[in-house]
Swiss-Prot record:
Protein name from the UniProt record: Phosphate propanoyltransferase
Organism for this UniProt entry: Rhodobacter capsulatus (strain ATCC BAA-309 / NBRC 16581 / SB1003)
Cellular component per GO, a single term: bacterial microcompartment
Pfam families: PTAC
Positions bound to Zn(2+) 1: 37, 39, 98
GO MF term set: acyltransferase activity, transferring groups other than amino-acyl groups; metal ion binding
One of the GO biological process terms: propanediol catabolic process
Free-text comment on the cofactor: There are 2 Zn(2+) ions per monomer; Zn(2+) and CoA bind inbetween the 2 domains in each monomer.
InterPro entries reported in the protein's UniProt record: PTAC
Residues annotated to bind Zn(2+) 2: 146, 148, 193
EC number of the protein: 2.3.1.222
Keyword field: Acyltransferase, Bacterial microcompartment, Metal-binding, Transferase, Zinc
Substrates-to-products reaction catalysed: propanoyl-CoA + phosphate = propanoyl phosphate + CoA
Co-factor requirement: Zn(2+)
Length: 215
């Protein structure tokens, strides 16, 4: 087992290399692969983990202020359950559950492909925690791939929030991802978000660099 200090130093060096590469060529952006996860509202947090419960910060994420929590829940649909689904913090105004297409088959639901926050008419399921459960009539989506981008990077690339770009992937499973939406604001770190299915299809892992191409 390697000491945590060594692991942290190696990760910091790798991240610094990614930042240096993207500063040299703004068209290169790092990838963040999202597995199934849940964002909870305050009322649902109370119902699942007990009144006044708070999330336990486990690991910081690249997007400022966001983190993976130690807490997990079980998702229950008409056809099955998926356990140990990570909760991400901080709490949100509305509960949002992001899963893959394959997860939808396991659960027996058909979540729409949506951008984060677009929950009207989305799928529902039951979320089970250690202190109780909540049944959501909506809130389940398959997240559309997108790129969070610092404003200065967006300016250098000549793109803005809402623009659709192509992303070119190199390697044995390389190809082009179309219909990738830009999301740029002052609190964003530049990073492309895809789900596990997309990552597997293109042979990508966290922190891999891909190239943005305007269309």
């Amino acid at each position: 087992m390697f000491p945590q200090s060594l692991i942290d130093r190696i990760l910091a060096e790798l991240l610094a290399q990614d930042v240096a590469a993207t500063d040299t060529d703004p068209a290169l952006v790092p990838v963040g692969v999202s597995n199934r996860h849940v964002h909870l509202s305050r009322p649902d947090m109370d119902a699942l983990f007990g009144p006044g419960a708070s999330l336990t910060r486990m690991k910081a994420m690249k997007q400022p202020g966001q983190y993976a929590a130690a807490e997990t829940v079980t998702l229950r649909g008409p056809k099955g359950d998926i356990g140990k689904v990570r909760v991400l913090g901080p709490l949100r105004k509305e509960t949002q559950i992001e899963i893959s297409v394959a997860d939808g088959f396991t659960l027996g639901i058909k979540p729409p492909m949506r951008m984060s926050g677009k929950l009207d008419g989305s799928a529902g399921l039951t979320v089970i925690g250690p202190a109780g459960s909540v049944t959501k009539e909506a809130g389940v989506i398959v997240a559309l791939r997108h790129i969070h981008m610092r404003p200065e990077d967006a300016v250098r690339l000549g793109v803005k929030t809402g623009d659709s770009v192509d992303v070119v992937v190199s390697g044995p499973r390389g190809g082009v991802m179309h219909n990738v939406t830009i999301r740029s604001d002052e609190v964003s770190a530049t990073e492309m978000h895809i789900d596990v299915e997309e990552a597997n299809a293109f042979g990508l892992q966290n922190d891999a660099l891909v190239r943005v191409r305007k269309v």
